[in-house]
Swiss-Prot record:
Pfam families: CheD. HAMAP family: CheD. One of its GO terms (biological process) is chemotaxis. One of its GO terms (molecular function) is protein-glutamine glutaminase activity. It catalyses: L-glutaminyl-[protein] + H2O = L-glutamyl-[protein] + NH4(+). Residues 1-23 are annotated as: Disordered. Probably deamidates glutamine residues to glutamate on methyl-accepting chemotaxis receptors (MCPs), playing an important role in chemotaxis. It comes from the Bacteria. Residues 1-18 have a biased composition (Low complexity). This is Probable chemoreceptor glutamine deamidase CheD 1. Belongs to the CheD family. The lineage of its organism: Bacteria, Pseudomonadati, Myxococcota, Myxococcia, Myxococcales. The keyword Cell inner membrane does not apply. The gene is cheD1. Disulfide bonds: none annotated.
Length: 171
């Protein structure tokens, strides 16, 4: 696992005795199309391919959350968090309802691999998902402090909602 923190990616391994899911935190596994938010120490875990996870954190309130979406744009009849256009605004609203101040929110973005990129002419859903997430966060004026996106391999992600730390391991 590598840990990402701060404005620039920090790819150092966890310090001795430091474990990604440790520290007495509850642990939640997030499936595609889900959103998890917590106001107490919690490690949210997910596995991403072309899907994207947006992690939001309020460093003052120590509240945060994560979404995991599959496709960039929702269809008219379905307002599901499986779609980025639904999942990102829902995550922002949920984190604020849990006690975060919108003006204090910072983001990290992960995933968006081109796992089917070997097929010529295949649509690059991973890249579309990443671009949508970055655009929606920019429109919401939420700064993106870190990202680990693209490539051809999936990722396992662990995010601590209370301190904003994230660990990523390519699969």
């Amino acid at each position: 696992m590598t840990r990402t923190t701060g404005a620039a990616p920090d790819r150092a391994a966890p310090a001795a005795g430091e474990t990604p899911g440790g520290g007495g935190r509850a642990q939640v596994y997030l499936h595609a199309g889900q959103i998890a938010v917590a106001a107490e120490p919690t490690a949210i875990v997910t596995v991403l391919g072309s899907c994207v996870a947006v992690c939001l954190h309020d460093p003052v309130a120590r509240v945060g959350g994560m979404n995991h979406f599959l496709l960039p744009l929702h269809v008219e009849r379905e307002q599901s968090a499986r779609f980025g256009t639904v999942a990102v605004p829902q995550l922002v609203e949920a984190v604020v309802r849990a006690g975060a101040r919108r003006a204090s929110l910072v983001a990290k973005v992960f995933g968006g691999a081109s796992v089917i990129g070997a097929f010529r002419g295949a649509r690059n859903l991973g890249d579309e998902n990443v671009q949508l997430a970055l655009r929606l966060l920019d429109e919401a004026r939420i700064p993106v402090l870190d990202r680990d996106v693209g490539g051809a391999r999936g990722r396992k992600l662990i995010f601590h909602v209370d301190d904003g730390a994230a660990w990523v391991r390519q699969l």
